[in-house]
Curated annotation (Swiss-Prot):
Residues annotated as binding Fe cation: H557, H562, H749, N753, I899
Biased composition (Basic residues): 271-280
Cofactor note: Binds 1 Fe cation per subunit.
Record-given protein name: Linoleate 13S-lipoxygenase 2-1, chloroplastic
GO terms assigned for molecular function: linoleate 13S-lipoxygenase activity; metal ion binding; oxidoreductase activity, acting on single donors with incorporation of molecular oxygen, incorporation of two atoms of oxygen
Length: 899
């Protein structure tokens, strides 16, 4: 039986004593540069690791013919860069002279005679040939016989420009090659004189760290934490925390550009990465904004990525397409005059005359959106027909589809079981009016044809609700003061039919007291057997759908995946060494999340950005997500099984698959999600149990305990005193915590992100804002007459304006897009995992189970008994299929939140 961490693969790259070549001619051909015994890492005033190397004290040794040693070759793979500048010429000269990349090999263990670190072996790497678009640098070393295993390599980049180092392979050891995976930007020594540290691919708990690199391990973490002083520079890798205080312009004379600070007692929020930008002059709690938003260097989108990389497409749409649209649609309140005008977005397009010199680049980056019409020489924004309307153009109009999408649409996280009757608000009635709902027992029983009583329906788990009443009601009067948005608190009741589908029964819209008017509320039902009632129902649905769209984007998507994950990333880099096995397990799940979040703060969720200008809360959008965080977010309930239980959609049952019995058997998101959850959990279980075979290793792991403490007390510090935080004392505790995190970054995010264009690209299906009040709310005689004469126009006026709709459609298109280099879960093994045969085998099982899930989902989508994912014109539910081709496909589960 393989013992944890001890058994080695026959192809392991573990660095052992090299094979010795004692030929004196061979030895004499290799100079050895050995660092002095005082080789140290000093903490400078910014706490960056500094490797004290004095060239004058370094000796160039030539071994005698009796002194055993061997020559090894290190090959450094560097990815070619674009956007090169004038310093390239100087760097080319340095490459020719062989003085551009300096390496040190560091021994894994201390000198057993002296008890101190062994001298490092130094050599310059010379530029070699280019291979598959990468550049190889080669260095020759002579390794003394008593050097032992390689523990790390230090790099000094003597170019004037940073370089992206992919890996280093050292060949010549008797037991095979040593591989060191880097995948990191190495700064120029002209920006920062400190050397970079890269550890070997073997993972170690802190207590098992080889003695020769234990100090490097600790000091590298000190470097990554920084000292919290000053504005961060583009080449730095410092991870620190700050509140969301950069969404508005605190120094602006326009109050409409200012936003409150999110994070703290009044508006609790997760923390973001600290940039160190100067504070506002008028509000010292706020940070000034700038065009450059710092993220640690390795978190940024790589400039060597494909132009089709999703980050580039988002940037292009935000900074070129959206401004061009705004210049064309001069009236921001102009709606669509008729439904054919909406259809024209997909077959005629919108002229974009203002692209100018950005045009050629946009054709390459967003070819789905920007089309050149050759016969007219016009550039147009031409949308592709979303999958929903390709299958059934009128599906958005039907109640059965409205209900189905609560289980198999963009936002499957909001539907809840009704457990009490009658419905009551928990808000203060002195402020918001009577708490009792107007949805009566009689109405419900009438809508279900007296099939059963309300009491029986509640007892038998037949009633479900979309409840945005108490969350939205405190913001109704604030939002209604804004131009172009009309808000209500809403409740929508559904009935679970014998066929396993949901049937909408009633919508209640509520306005709290305002000025001298009392609370207003009204209930609408789909079976008002007259034309007026039918149109009122469609208008009420438009309001509810705008609420669900806003909640989806602000809470289910932004808050619960992007925003809440950033503290996990910061804590992991500050507290877990790069050689820690848990860091290496989590790392693929964190790629590019901080950069996409920074881009969101710059132009999506900022004051007057795309979200505020196009979704119903307007300037209160992100503030509303703070309210939801304070009232609803719990780490323990981010785990899919616990989330389903908390919403009444499942109960624990050991006799059922996944240990849960679902309240709605045909619940596509839950059905597929639970299979994926179990696959992730088994992978995490195998991984954790391998590195923590004894329970006491969890509590004694100082890095792990510091990591979890920092997540709870700093990253999510506004929730630090909550009793629901899991303990971290056993391997099972760790398995639960890690599985929850990786589920959020993979399955949860995929479920709420990659179907956005398919479901919401045709905006009548998912309007982001309702711009007009209900015709029955305090109407004048003229208003009522207009509605009675032009109900279709009333619905169109309620929908988003032309600029709101097209901006959101363009953004949703790129957010739903998979880049050609997308990294899907279980597709490729990480080099660190492949290093260990036990983890390698566990990954093969993980990958195989994910391929099986593909087949399971296909079979379910072809099962005619599953009406929530199969039927005439029904979109199959594929959002949790693990793999996808590039483009807008409505499927595919990447490791990380990179879009």
């Amino acid at each position: 039986m393989l013992k944890p961490q001890l058994q080695q693969s026959s192809q392991s790259t573990k660095a052992l004593i090299p094979s010795w070549n004692t030929n004196p001619l061979f030895l004499a051909s290799f100079p050895i540069n050995i660092l002095n015994k005082n080789f140290r890492l000093k903490k400078k005033n910014n706490f960056r690791v500094h490797h004290n190397y004095n060239g004058a004290s370094t000796t160039k040794a030539v071994l005698s013919s009796t002194e055993k040693a061997t020559g090894v070759k290190a090959v450094v793979t560097v990815q070619k860069q674009v956007n090169l500048n004038l310093s390239r010429g100087l760097d080319d000269i340095g490459d020719l002279l062989g003085k551009s990349l300096l390496l040190w090999i560091v021994a894994a263990e201390l000198d057993h005679k002296t008890g101190i670190e062994k001298p490092g072996i130094r050599a310059y790497a010379h530029r070699g040939r280019d291979v598959d678009g990468d550049t190889h640098y080669e260095a020759d070393f002579v390794i003394p016989q008593d050097f032992g295993e390689v523990g790390a390599i230090l790099i000094e980049n003597e170019h004037h420009k940073e370089m992206y180092v992919k890996n280093i392979v050292i060949d010549g050891f008797v037991h095979g090659k040593v591989e060191i995976t880097c995948n990191s930007w190495v700064h120029s020594k002209f920006d920062n004189p400190d050397k970079r540290i890269f550890f070997t691919n073997k993972s170690y708990l802190p207590s098992q760290t080889p003695s020769g690199v234990s100090r490097l391990r600790e000091e590298e973490l000190v470097t990554l934490r920084g000292d919290g002083i000053g504005e961060r520079k583009v080449f730095e890798r410092i991870y620190d925390y700050d509140v969301y205080n950069d969404l508005g312009e605190a120094d602006s004379n326009n109050d409409d550009a200012k936003r409150p600070v999110l994070g703290g007692k009044e508006l609790p929020y997760p923390r973001r990465c600290k940039t160190g930008r100067p504070r506002s002059k008028k509000d010292p709690l706020s940070e000034t904004r700038s065009t450059f938003v710092y993220v640690p260097r390795d978190e940024a989108f790589s400039e060597v990525k494909s132009v089709a990389f999703s980050g580039n497409t988002v940037y292009s749409v935000l900074h070129a397409v959206v401004p061009a649209l705004e210049s064309v649609v001069t009236d921001p309140n102009l709606g669509f005059p008729h439904f054919p005008a909406i259809d024209s977005l997909f077959n005629v397009g919108v002229d974009l005359p203002g692209l100018g010199d950005k045009k050629s680049g946009l054709f390459n980056v967003v070819p789905r959106l920007i089309k050149a019409i050759s016969d007219t020489r016009k550039d147009v924004l031409l949308f592709e027909s979303p999958q929903l309307v390709q299958r059934d153009k009128f599906s958005w109009f039907r109640d059965v589809e409205f209900a189905r999408q609560t289980l198999a649409g963009l936002n499957p996280y909001s539907i809840r079981l009704v457990t009490e009757w009658p419905l009551r608000s928990k808000l203060d009635p002195k402020v918001y009016g009577p708490p009792e709902s107007e949805i009566t027992k009689e109405l419900i029983e009438k809508e279900i044809g007296n099939y059963m009583t309300v009491e029986q329906a509640v007892q038998q788990k037949k009633l479900f609700i979309l409840d945005y009443h108490d969350l939205l009601l405190p913001y109704v009067n604030k939002v209604n003061e804004l131009k172009g948005s009309m808000l209500y608190g809403s409740r929508t009741i559904f009935f679970l039919t014998p066929q396993g589908t949901l049937k909408p029964l009633a919508i209640e819209l509520t306005r709290p007291p305002v000025d001298d008017k009392p609370q207003w509320k009204e209930v609408y039902s789909p079976n008002d057997w007259n034309a007026t009632g039918a149109w009122l129902w469609k208008l009420a649905k438009a309001h509810v759908l705008s609420h669900d769209s806003g909640y989806h984007q602000l809470v289910s998507h932004w808050l619960r995946t992007h925003c809440c994950t950033e503290p996990y990333i910061i804590a992991s880099n500050r507290q877990l060494s790069a050689m820690h096995p848990i860091y290496r397990l989590l790392h693929p799940h964190f790629r590019y999340t901080m950069e996409i979040n920074a881009l969101a703060r710059e132009a999506l969720i900022n004051a007057n950005g795309v979200i505020e200008s196009s979704f119903f809360p307007g300037k209160y959008a992100i503030e509303l997500s703070s309210i939801a965080y304070g009232a609803e977010w719990r780490f323990d309930q981010e785990a899919l099984p616990q989330n389903l239980i908390s919403r009444g959609l499942a109960v624990e049952d050991p006799n059922e698959p996944h240990g849960l019995k679902l309240a709605i058997e045909d619940y596509p998101f839950a059905n597929d999600g639970l299979v994926l959850w179990d696959i992730l959990k088994q992978w995490v279980t195998n991984y954790v149990n391998h590195y923590y075979p004894q329970t006491n290793l969890i509590e004694s792991d100082k890095e792990l305990q510091a990591w979890w403490s920092e997540i709870k007390n700093v990253g999510h510090g506004d929730k630090r005193d909550e009793p629901w935080w899991p303990e971290l004392k056993t391997p099972n505790d760790l398995i639960g915590i890690i599985t929850t995190i990786v589920w959020v970054t993979s399955g949860h995010h995929a479920a709420v992100n990659f179907g956005q264009y398919s479901y919401a690209g045709y905006f009548p299906n998912r309007p982001t804002v309702a711009r007009s009040k209900m015709p029955t709310e305090d109407p004048t005689a003229e208003e009522w007459e207009w509605f009675m004469n032009k109900p279709e126009e009333a619905l169109l006026r309620c929908f988003p304006s032309q600029i709101q709709a097209t901006k959101v459609m363009a953004i949703l298109d790129v957010l739903s897009n998979h880049s050609p280099d997308e990294e899907y879960i279980g597709e490729k093994i990480e080099p660190y995992w492949a290093e260990d045969p036990v983890i390698n085998a566990a990954f093969e099982v993980f990958s195989g189970k994910l391929k099986e899930l593909e087949g399971i989902i296909d079979a379910r989508n072809n099962d005619s008994k599953l009406s929530n994912r199969n039927g005439a014109g029904v979109m199959p539910y594929e959002l949790l299929k693990p793999y996808s081709e590039p483009g807008v496909t409505g499927k595919g589960v990447p490791y990380s939140i990179s879009i």
